[in-house]
Every structure is written in C-alpha cells, then in structure tokens.
UniProtKB/Swiss-Prot annotation:
Binding-site list for Ca(2+) 4: 508, 510, 512, 514, 519
Binding site for Ca(2+) 1: 402, 404, 406, 413
Protein origin, superkingdom: Eukaryota
Keyword line: ATP-binding, Calcium, Kinase, Lipoprotein, Membrane, Metal-binding, Myristate, Nucleotide-binding, Repeat, Serine/threonine-protein kinase, Transferase
Function: May play a role in signal transduction pathways that involve calcium as a second messenger. May function in signal transduction pathways that positively regulate responses to cold, salt and drought stresses.
Protein's name in the database: Calcium-dependent protein kinase 13
Species per Swiss-Prot/TrEMBL record: Oryza sativa subsp. japonica
Lipid attachment site numbers (N-myristoyl glycine): 2
E.C. numbers: 2.7.11.1
Further facts: Plants over-expressing CPK13 display enhanced tolerance to cold, drought and salt stresses.
Active site: 212
GO function term, MF aspect, one: calcium/calmodulin-dependent protein kinase activity
Gene this chain is encoded by: CPK13
GO CC annotation terms, alphabetical: cytoplasm; membrane; nucleus
GO terms (BP aspect): intracellular signal transduction; positive regulation of response to salt stress; response to cold; response to water deprivation
C-alpha cells in the first residue's frame, strides 16, 4: 500500500491536516515486568501518584467522587485480614491489567520486594465476580510450590480493594528474553516449551485448567535465568473434575482452541494453546491469522496449519510432528500434557537441533509483541481528537445512559441503556464491555472512556480520525512518521519505546525508513487489536450502529 496508494493517501492527509484537532494530554499505564504486567519498559516507570494509590488513605466521599467503591462494600474474601500497609510499603505502579493494577511492594519485616495486584471491589458486580477472585486466590495457593508458577505470598482486603501479594517477576516477558538472546534455536524453543507444558501438566494433575495461556502470561523471575520462567495470572482458571465439560468462551483469539469456540471443552484446550505458543516460538507468527477477529476464529475452526512458508522448510520434522499433534482439532485425539513432555523433540537431551533459527523469526516475534501497543496509543489519540460536533451523537447516548447525571455510567445504567437501544447482550457480555471500557478500573465508565470504547467499535476506520492520529505522531508535519517521533509520542504517553524500529519496519512497505499515511492506515486497519476476557464487540457494534444518535 505504501507504493500503490501512498501518494494519494498522503495528499488526503495533508489536506486534512490543518483541520485535524488533537490533544497531547492522554495518559497511559506504565508497563513493567511483574505479575499481571504485559510488557517490560525500557526504563523504570514513574512512581505512582499518591492520590491514585489503592492503599492510600482517603475519605469515603472522595472515593465516591472518583467512582471508587463505597466504604460499606461487603467482604470478598469472607474473613478478616491484616492491614496491607502494616506489612508492606507500597511502591510504583508496575502494570495495568484488565481487572487490577499491579504495584511494587516491599515487605517491612524482611525488605523483600513483591508484586501486589489490587482489584477494585467496584468491579466485582455479581456473585460470580466475587467467586472468580476467591477461586483465583485458591488456585494460586493450590499450585504453590511449583517452581514455574508464580508464588502467592498472601491476600488482603480493605474497604475498596482486594490485594494479592505475589512473587515479583522482574526478569521480563518470555518473548523479550528470546529477543535479547540473539542466538535462538529449536533446542532453546524445546526447553521453553518443556517448562510451559510442565506447568500445564502440573495444573491438570491438580485438577486445574488455566484457560488463558499466552506468552505474556509467562514472565522470568530473573532476567539471567531462563529456567526461572513463571506462569502468572490465574484469573480465568477453574477447578475441574475428570470428564467435566465447560461452555463459557474465555481466552484470547489467537490462542483459543476450537472446542472453546464450540462451547464444549475440557483441559485439552490448554494443550492446544501451548501448541500455538510453540508455533509462535519457532516462526514468530501465530498459526491462525486473519484480518479480523471473526476471521481468526474461522481459521481456528478450519484448523489448517501452514508448514510451507518460511521458516518451516528448515524446521525439523519432529517439531512439526509435535505441533500437529498438539493442534489436533479433535480434543480426545490430542496429546495430553504428559504425552507432550514424552515426545522425542521436547525431551531433555532430545532431538531438537541446536542450529540457530532464521533471524527473521526473532524480528517477527518482536513485531508481534510491539504492534498492538502503537495501535492502542493511536486509538487513545483518536478518541482525544474528536470534535464536539463529531461526538454529539455519542454524547447524547452517554447522557441517556447516565441516568443519575453523575458523569459516569454504572453497570446497571449501562445494562438499562443498552436495553433501551435494542441490545440483546447477555449480562456477562455487558460486564465484558465494562471491563473493556473502564480504563482506570474505577468500576464505572466516564465520558472519555465511553467515547474511546464506542470509537473502538464503530469509528476506528473513519479516515478523518486516522488523519488526526497520524497528525499527532507526525510532529514536524512532514507527512511521515519517524522513529524519533514515535519515541517522543511514547514518552508523552509514558509507554515503553522498545522495538519501535520494528514497528517502523513492519509498517514501512516502501522501505524508506518511515511511515507515510497510506502505510499508517494499512497498519491501523489490519488484523486484530486484541480482546481481553471474552468476545462481544461484534454484537455490540450491531446493537449500537443502528441506535438513535449513533455515529
């Protein structure tokens, strides 16, 4: 697209540039290498503001003004716990997850650092939500002692939050470690896969199904020790009995097993997901890929595995045999975790060759990890750049849903508002919308969050908004985005700027070292931006697209 359409699209961009509004005060959550933290920054994140800290003292009225929990919320853990601040000194924010924020904390009695995931009780809307948190803590304790599972230190509860203190994984994300090594071989991939599948086997032997295995849920406790790989985030994990089947669709699109999409699955789904991770470790790309989320699901159900494209012609037959058996679309014929560990390719001192993989594989892994960051930053820029005229319809919709005129939409208001607009979403799907839109984990959706969420659904591909986002990154107005300009934007958003060269290289189709407008549009409209816990965006889009006042 950079060659064929770049000129005309760049002209459109330049013609729009003078009228494209933009703001530079958008905010982002710092990411760090710790439990519940998706990425490691290139530099330490700034210390969290005291006013934003979940364990800072604040009056109930102030908490309510911020949309936090009222002081009289019932107990989640079901028993009294010590005061977290009596035991730990709280530090900087490490990461922002979908259901909680992770902070660095230091045990006062020992000086040992830990990670503390703080979950807002306002997000625990139903009895099921409360049970989910209890179960996550129970499962972490149940798996305690496994060397490759993050260790839980304790769980605490106050008026506003549930806090889970756990082992600090300061060594970074799995993919980041692979990239840093430089030399990367099938044998190294086999070692890493052996650890990952070992965790799966341990979970299954203890009656636990993880249900959300993915590379970002494996972190290193020590950056110098590959064997310190730890599985984190058991928020979607469940206990199961032999023969028991599950029907709720959870997980992430690239990694979800076909039987999960068909709503009839068991622990075999974890083995499928581990097979997807192995495919990515060896090639740098997911095995089931499409331009849309629905396309990804269709590819998963079709089950075709590409072993013809590079680098697969030089990958060993034994590796491909293992992947084929892990990605068997028939769960009962799929290898168990124990059988995977017995496969010749993966066994210690097995047949996996030690010759280096094509460097392009490392590059693909970097791109796969980095691209979504830029898209999400651009999405926030677009949301902040909308004119008052353009968001009038969405503003009206927001005001209609905000029944008490508080400036924030609660779960009940969202549910009732969507019903008025003809939505047939289930309660769990509405809860998913809350999770996706509630950026600051306040338990409510404020005006900017609402605009960003609805923009994500039905306005991303509007050209004038793409122009506004491009204009934000194109600091000098040259019509091109450079690495330096992306670094500046990342600094403004407090985002890590590692691997921006790879973002440029993937989007730069005419190889001139920069991104023109046509290439930017291609990047923004290609593929899937990532969905968290469950998928409901398409049905919501249908409901809202025809609603009164929808844009």
């Amino acid at each position: 697209m950079g060659n064929a359409c770049g000129g005309s699209l760049r002209s459109k961009y330049l013609s729009f540039k003078q009228t494209a509004s933009q703001r530079h005060d958008t905010d982002d959550n710092n990411n760090a290498a710790a439990a519940d933290s998706p990425k490691k920054p290139s530099r330490p994140p700034a210390a969290a503001k005291t006013d934003d800290h979940p364990v800072s003292a604040s009056a109930p009225a102030a908490a309510m003004r911020r949309g936090q929990a009222p002081a009289d919320l019932g107990s989640v853990l079901g028993h009294p716990t010590p005061n977290l601040r009596d035991l730990y000194a709280m530090g900087r924010k490490l990461g922002q997850g979908q259901f909680g924020t992770t902070y660095l904390c230091t045990e006062l009695s020992t000086g040992v650092d830990y990670a503390c995931k703080s979950i807002s009780k306002r997000k625990l809307i139903t009895k099921e939500d409360i049970e989910d948190v209890r179960r996550e803590i129970q499962i972490m304790h149940h798996l305690s002692g496994h060397k490759n599972v993050v260790a839980i230190k304790g769980a605490y509860e106050d008026q506003l939050y549930v806090h889970i203190v756990m082992e600090l994984c300061a060594g970074g994300e799995l993919f980041d470690r692979i990239i840093q090594r430089g030399h990367y071989s099938e044998r190294k991939a086999a070692e890493l896969t052996r650890i990952i599948v070992g965790v799966v086997e341990a979970c299954h032997s203890l009656g636990v199904m993880h249900r959300d295995l993915k590379p970002e849920n494996f972190l290193l406790a020590n950056k110098d020790d590959d064997l310190s790989l730890k599985a984190i985030d058991f928020g979607l994990s469940v206990f199961f009995k032999p023969g028991q089947t599950f029907t709720d669709v959870v997980g992430s699109p690239y990694y979800v097993a076909p039987e999960v999409l068909l709503k009839h699955y068991g622990p075999e789904a974890d083995v499928w997901t581990a097979g997807v991770i192995l495919y990515i470790l060896l090639s740098g790309v997911p095995p089931f890929w499409a331009e849309t989320q629905q396309g990804i699901f269709d590819a998963v159900l079709k089950g075709f595995i590409d072993f013809d494209s590079d680098p697969w012609p030089v990958i060993s037959e034994s590796a491909k045999d293992l992947i084929t058996k892990m990605l068997n679309p028939r769960p009962k014929e799929r290898l168990t975790a124990h059988e995977v560990l017995c496969h010749p390719w993966i066994r210690d001192h097995g047949v996996a060759p030690d010759r280096p993989l094509d460097p392009a594989v490392l590059s693909r892994i970097k791109q796969f990890s980095a691209m979504n960051k830029l898209k999400k930053m651009a999405l926030r820029v677009i949301a902040e750049s909308l004119s008052e005229e353009e968001i009038a319809g969405l503003k009206e919709m927001f005001q209609t849903m905000d029944a008490d005129n508080s400036g924030a939409i609660t779960y009940d208001e969202l549910k009732e508002g969507l019903r008025k607009y003809g939505s047939t979403l289930k309660d769990t799907e509405i809860r998913d919308l809350m999770d996706a839109a509630d950026i600051d984990n306040s338990g409510t959706i404020d005006y900017i969050e609402f605009i960003a969420a609805t923009l994500h659904l039905n306005k991303l591909e509007r050209e004038e908004h793409l122009v506004a986002a491009f204009s934000y990154f194109d600091k000098d107005g040259s019509g091109y985005i450079t690495v330096d300009e992306l670094q500046q934007a990342c600094k403004e958003h407090n985002m890590p700027d590692a691997f921006l060269d790879d973002v440029i290289n993937e989007a730069d189709q005419d190889n001139d070292g920069r991104i023109d407008y046509g290439e930017f549009v291609a990047m923004m409209t290609k593929g899937n931006m990532g969905v968290g816990r469950r998928t409901m965006r398409n049905s919501l889009n249908i409901s809202m697209r025809d609603a009164p006042g929808a844009l």
